[in-house]
């Protein structure tokens, strides 16, 4: 308890402040001064539904379905002759990292976004991985139990359309 009283808050926000003035703030006592912002109430309530869903569907069924989607996406992407896929499907599920030759990953993401497709781009906090492949970043697609093969087909169709624009 003595340490809690000696430590200063590392961030600010609602629910942790006794009083705010133009030149100072007074914080709540004890651990309360470290509880900035609104607690994640909706996330806690939603987590229960997530557990129910996983128990109903079965974690192994979810894994198998995601693995099937990943294999399908990998097969479709492998048909491109101007793509570099950085993942080994045998050791990966749900995420595929790639680059298209001659197309910057951020440009790709911006145009796919216009087609309501969200991908991640950049170094993904994995700079050693990027250095290993001598790249600054890549595009990363991922999917889960809520995706379908139709989603992947739409992605592939959109990827072809975007390539025509950017090349």
Spans of model-derived segments:
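Pyridoxal 5′-phosphate
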Residues: 1-167
């Amino acid at each position: 308890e003595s340490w809690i009283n000696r430590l200063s808050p590392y961030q600010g926000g609602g629910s942790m402040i006794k009083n705010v003035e133009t030149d100072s703030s007074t914080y709540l006592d004890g651990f309360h001064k470290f509880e900035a912002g609104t607690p994640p109430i909706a996330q806690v309530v939603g987590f229960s539904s997530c557990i129910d869903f996983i128990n109903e569907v079965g974690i192994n069924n979810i894994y198998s379905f995601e693995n099937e989607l990943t294999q399908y996406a990998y097969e479709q992407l492998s048909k491109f002759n101007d793509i570099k896929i950085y993942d080994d499907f045998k050791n990966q599920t749900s995420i595929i990292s790639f680059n298209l030759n001659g197309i910057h990953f951020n440009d790709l993401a911006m145009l796919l976004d216009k087609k309501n497709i969200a991908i991640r781009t950049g170094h993904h906090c994995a700079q050693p991985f990027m250095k290993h492949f001598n790249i600054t970043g890549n595009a990363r697609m991922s999917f889960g139990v809520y995706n379908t093969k139709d989603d992947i087909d739409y992605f592939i169709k959109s990827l072809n359309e975007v390539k025509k624009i950017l090349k």
